[in-house]
Amino acid sequence: MSFSVDVLANIAIELQRGIGHQDRFQRLITTLRQVLECDASALLRYDSRQFIPLAIDGLAKDVLGRRFALEGHPRLEAIARAGDVVRFPADSELPDPYDGLIPGQESLKVHACVGLPLFVGQNLIGALTLDGMQPDQFDVFSDEELRLIAALAAGALSNALLIEQLESQNMLPGDATPFEAVKQTQMIGLSPGMTQLKKEIEIVAASDLNVLISGETGTGKELVAKAIHEASPRAVNPLVYLNCAALPESVAESELFGHVKGAFTGAISNRSGKFEMADNGTLFLDEIGELSLALQAKLLRVLQYGDIQRVGDDRSLRVDVRVLAATNRDLREEVLAGRFRADLFHRLSVFPLSVPPLRERGDDVILLAGYFCEQCRLRQGLSRVVLSAGARNLLQHYSFPGNVRELEHAIHRAVVLARATRNGDEVILEAQHFAFPEVTLPPPEAAAVPVVKQNLREATEAFQRETIRQALAQNHHNWAACARMLETDVANLHRLAKRLGLKD
C-alpha cells in the first residue's frame, strides 16, 4: 500500500515533537519503519567516505557503533554515488551491510533493500536505508513517494548540522542548553556519562585552558585529548604526544625541551623538544603523574611564563602551547603524599575532565563492540563479523577492568578464534569465543512455571492489559507515544484498549 499526504504530515509532526537531534532522528526512522512496514531502517551521516549510523530501528544495537567505510560496503558506495532512489534486487550480488544484524534473524540475509541518498544542494550529507526480509517488500512504493521521504530526512539532518555549526561559532541566540553533537565520530557512546563528557569537551575545546584528563587505564584518555584538539582553534597546528611513563629520567628533560649539540654524550646535533614541536598547537602529556618532582618544577615554569630552555643552552625560547595532561592516578592523593607538586596540579586542572570506566557506561559496551567488529572485518577481509545474542549478553555482564582497551583486544581475539572454527568469510562471535574470568550471567527469566488459572484468551488479554498500562505510565498517558513504544498503529491501540476495558 502507498501512503498519503497525511502520512507525510504525521512524519513531519513527529520530527517537530522531538527534543534534540537524537530524539528527532529516532522518531523519524521509527515512524518510517511503521509506515513502510519494513524490518529495519537506519539514518546514516556521510563523512570522509564512510557512513556513520545516527539512529536505527529493527537492527542490532551494535550497529550504532559501526563505521561503514565505502570501500568495504559496495551497496553503501552505490547509494553514495547515486543521485536518486536505489533499489537492490533480491538476487543482488552486492552484500548487504546489515546481513546478520537484524535481531532474531541473524542467520538470514536481507532480501529487499532501498537506499535513499540525502543531499543539501549537490552535497551528500547522509542516507536512509530500508531493509526487509521479503523480496518484493518495497515494490508498492513509488520512487516519487520515497523521494518525499528522503527530502524530509535530508531536512532534519541538514538542520541538525546547521544548528551544530552555528553553536560552535557562538552564533545561536540566548543561553540555550548545548545541542548534542552530530559530527562526533570517534567518541562512541550514548550513556549519560559519555554524553556529559562530550558536552564538556565541546565547552573546553573552544577555550585555551589547560585540561587534566583523569580516568582508569584503557578508558580512552588519548581519544579525549584528540577530540579537544580537533575541536579547538589550534586544530590546524600539530597535536604532539608524549608518554611520560616511558621516559627514562636521563632523557626526559631533552624530550620535553630539546638540547643543543654537545650538551651531553651522544648529543651530536641540535634537537627540538616536544614543546617546540607543539608550538602554536597542543601538547598531550600522557601519564603525567610519572614525572619526577624536578621535571615537574621545570614544566611548571613553562606553564607560568611560556618559555623553555634547551638542555645545554642559556637562551630562552618563547613557545605558545596548550597542554592537555592525562593520568590514571588520583593526583590529589599524590599531592598529599608529596609525589606531585600542588602548584603544578592547580595549573593543569583548570578544567578537569573525568573519563568514565566501561563498567559504568551501560550499553556503550555493545556499541564499542560493533565498532571493533567492523574494524576486524575490514582488516581481515571478512564479509561480516556479528555478535550472537549470547555474546552480547556476556559483554554486558563483564566488568572489563581493562576498560575499552580490554574490549578491543577481546573482540580481536574472538574473531581469530571464531574464524579458525568456521569455513568461509562470515564470522559469528559466540560467548565461548571470549575468555573472561568468573562472569556470572543472570538466570533465564522463565525459570519458574506459573500455575495456570485462566484459559488462553483470558491470559492473553490480561497480558495485553498490563502491557498497555505500563506503556501508558512510562509515556505519561500519551497514547501516540505509547503506540510507538508498542510498535503498533495508534488507532488499533485505541480499539484494543476499549475492548480490554481501558478506555470508555
From Swiss-Prot:
InterPro entries: AAA+_ATPase, GAF, GAF-like_dom_sf, Homeodomain-like_sf, NorR, P-loop_NTPase, Sigma_54_int, Sigma_54_int_dom_ATP-bd_1. Pathway: Nitrogen metabolism; nitric oxide reduction. Keywords: ATP-binding, DNA-binding, Nucleotide-binding, Phosphoprotein, Transcription, Transcription regulation. Residues 479-498 bind DNA. Disulfide bonds: none annotated. GO terms for biological process: phosphorelay signal transduction system. It comes from the Bacteria. SMART domains: AAA, GAF. Transmembrane segments: none annotated. One of its GO terms (molecular function) is ATP binding. ATP binds at residues 215-222, 278-287. Residues 187-416 form the Sigma-54 factor interaction domain. PROSITE patterns: SIGMA54_INTERACT_1, SIGMA54_INTERACT_2, SIGMA54_INTERACT_3, SIGMA54_INTERACT_4. The modification 4-aspartylphosphate is found at D57. Required for the expression of anaerobic nitric oxide (NO) reductase, acts as a transcriptional activator for at least the norVW operon. Activation also requires sigma-54. This is Anaerobic nitric oxide reductase transcription regulator NorR. It comes from Shigella flexneri. The lineage of its organism: Bacteria, Pseudomonadati, Pseudomonadota, Gammaproteobacteria, Enterobacterales.
